[in-house]
């Protein structure tokens, strides 16, 4: 049985994205820029480097208002050239 994300969430709700990308200075700015387009606000993402330092993990939490917002952000964050994965 497959459960859909919108069946598990009650909106509005805090929703955290973890974005993994190349360890470049512009990664955080690009992530925040995309998030600001769909969920304007003040964000202070946390950044953790990988063990070898080649990648960074950026965690950012938004106040999601509907499932379409969540899905759109997954897609647009994944479309950033230096991003490798969005969880």
From Swiss-Prot:
It comes from Citrobacter koseri (strain ATCC BAA-895 / CDC 4225-83 / SGSC4696). InterPro entries: UPF0250_YbeD-like (IPR007454), YbeD-like_sf (IPR027471). Pfam families: DUF493. GO terms for cellular component: cytosol. Transmembrane segments: none annotated. Belongs to the UPF0250 family. This is UPF0250 protein CKO_02527. PANTHER family: UPF0250 PROTEIN YBED. The lineage of its organism: Bacteria, Pseudomonadati, Pseudomonadota, Gammaproteobacteria, Enterobacterales.
